[in-house]
UniProtKB/Swiss-Prot annotation:
The keyword Protein transport does not apply. It comes from the Bacteria. Pfam families: FAD_binding_3, Rng_hyd_C. Belongs to the PheA/TfdB FAD monooxygenase family. This is Anhydrotetracycline monooxygenase. It is an enzyme of class 1 (oxidoreductase). Disruption phenotype: Mutants fail to produce oxytetracyline but instead synthesize novel polyketides of shorter chain length. The gene is otcC. Pathway: Antibiotic biosynthesis; oxytetracycline biosynthesis. GO terms for biological process: antibiotic biosynthetic process. Keywords: Antibiotic biosynthesis, FAD, Flavoprotein, NADP, Oxidoreductase. Its cofactor is FAD. The keyword NADP applies.
């Protein structure tokens, strides 16, 4: 069987991409080198923009069930929470959702939609030509080959599709390394002054340029991290032992606090790298395969998730033959600068969490700035991805920005705009206007749904004064209309983002 798309990697990015591709009708195979799902969680939360996207695909309730809401974001553990409340969103918070649960929910959805998932199958080589990609795979029963139109590497920063392509991964080497343990502790952990709301327990050692921090994962289970900033770099892939963590805890905090019942051990660094390009012919990269960084502010999983939602509809339309030729190139053009911004802010956070006394003035200044509403909002927008704006033709300030989940007044009552995106199609929304939009957009009705609303239930929304919006499947506005503009530019926008009209 020839697949439309083969995805290497069954983490959150690969699984969400599989969901998006199946909604577009693409025959999709996911290959995961690990034979079994892991039972630990590297990432622990989803930010506001990711929650919005989950709502748009009908997955929001599953993620929000029993998930604590974190209403104050974290920047460099400076103790001043980021305020999401000024954004036009139904979700001014992050959700505490362990990655294991995220992957469980996304796996179930991908399989429900018809994606095929093979665990214990690793991509080992690839060859591509103008017609497709031949993927060499090693599975439990030996090597074999798979034919596909496109291959997407969502397999992380290690031995990956990116390396098989020979795509460079430039960036910055680490100046910090840490050991991590998810465990129980028999002794009371010290309360960490100045460690921030996300790290209520800890010890700061300016003399050692090191710190210990911990926060609760579940009753009596904590994630403990010990970080050093003046030690030789330790290979991130090197195994970590309980004794490594005990020794680090004792050196920095004076005790291992009776650590026991260890669930997970790992290490992290502030290595920061980004792929030189996200595409090579019929092979693309997404998630950690094209960007890695210090996991500060919980941005990594969300960055990859949003890569998947940006890429999925574009690749699906390309396979269906409805996309304009240049549509797939907009994936890298839009997402690479966003990832570069995340690398930039995590590099800044890496400096701010370094307990070197020389940086104390910088930390004090940053704390003062975080109390300035405009600065706080700017950083909250960065961390949550609520401020993302893609390059878009036109001058209206909403162009290229996410559409808020508006409560629409319709003939059937009030309905949230997000519910019209469950099928991952474009939406042409009219707001109480009599413009001949339906006739003009009729030739795209196989790709774009017309939603006629009388207006918005909440006054003072971001779309006040507009009579219509064209919104891409990923929720970003690509055309607007006002009474004075009529339908000017609608056909061009439809062609740009949804291809030529149907014959």
């Amino acid at each position: 069987m020839r697949y439309d798309v083969v995805i290497a990697g069954a983490g959150p990015t690969g699984l969400m991409l599989a969901c998006e591709l199946r909604l577009a009708g693409a025959r999709t195979l996911v290959l995961e080198r690990l034979a079994e799902r892991v039972d630990f969680s590297k990432a622990l939360g989803v930010h506001a923009r990711t929650v919005e996207l989950l709502d748009m695909r009908g997955l929001g309730r599953g993620f929000q069930a029993e998930a604590p809401k974190l209403r104050g974001g974290n920047f460099a553990s400076l103790g001043v929470p980021l305020d999401f409340s000024s954004f036009d969103t139904r979700h001014p918070y992050a959700l505490f959702v362990p990655q294991v649960r995220t992957e469980t929910l996304l796996t179930g959805r991908a399989l429900e939609l018809g994606a095929e998932l093979r665990r214990g199958h690793a991509v080992t080589a690839l060859e591509q030509d103008a017609d497709g990609v031949t993927v060499s795979v090693t599975g439990p029963e030996g090597p074999y080959e798979v034919e596909c139109a496109y291959l997407v590497g969502c397999d992380g920063g290690g031995i990956t599709v990116r390396k098989l392509l020979g795509i460079d991964f430039p960036g910055q080497d680490p100046h910090m390394f840490a050991v991590i343990a998810d465990a129980r502790f028999r002794e009371e952990l010290p309360h960490g002054e100045g460690m921030g709301p996300m790290r209520p327990y800890g010890v700061m050692r300016h003399d050692l340029r090191a710190w210990f921090a911990a926060f609760p994962l579940e009753p009596d289970v904590y994630r403990a991290t010990v970080a050093f900033f003046d030690r030789p770099y330790a290979d991130r892939r090197a195994p970590v032992t309980e004794e490594d963590v005990r020794a680090a805890l004792t050196e920095v905090a004076g005790s291992d606090f009776g650590m026991h019942d260890v669930r997970w051990l790992s290490r992290l660094t502030d290595t920061s790298r980004q792929a030189e390009r996200y595409r090579d012919g019929r092979v693309l990269l997404a998630g950690d395969a094209c960007h890695i960084h210090l996991p500060a502010g919980g941005q990594g999983l969300n960055l990859g998730f949003q890569d998947a939602v940006n890429l999925g509809w574009k690749l699906g339309a390309t396979i269906a033959g409805t996309a304009p030729p240049e549509l797939l190139d907009t994936y890298e053009a839009e997402r690479r600068p966003i990832a570069a911004g995340v690398l930039r802010n995590t590099r800044a956070q890496a400096v701010l969490i370094d307990p070197d006394p020389r940086y104390e003035g910088l930390r004090e200044l940053m704390i003062e700035l975080l109390h300035v509403p405009e600065t706080n909002r700017y950083l909250a927008g960065l961390i949550s991805a609520l401020d993302v704006r893609y390059p878009m033709a036109g001058e209206h300030p909403l162009l290229g920005r996410r559409v808020p989940d508006l409560p629409l007044v319709t003939e059937d009552g009030t309905r949230q705009l997000s519910t019209y995106f469950h099928a991952a199609r474009g939406v042409l929304l009219t707001l109480g206007c009599d413009q001949p939009l339906a006739d003009e957009a009729a030739a795209w009705k196989d790709r774009v749904d017309l939603v006629a609303a009388e207006g918005v239930a909440d006054p003072g929304s971001a779309v006040d004064g507009l009579t219509a919006l064209l919104v891409r499947p990923d929720g970003y506005i690509c055309w607007t209309a006002a009474p004075e503009t009529g339908t000017d530019g609608l056909t061009d926008a439809l062609r740009t983002w949804f291809g030529p009209p149907a014959m």
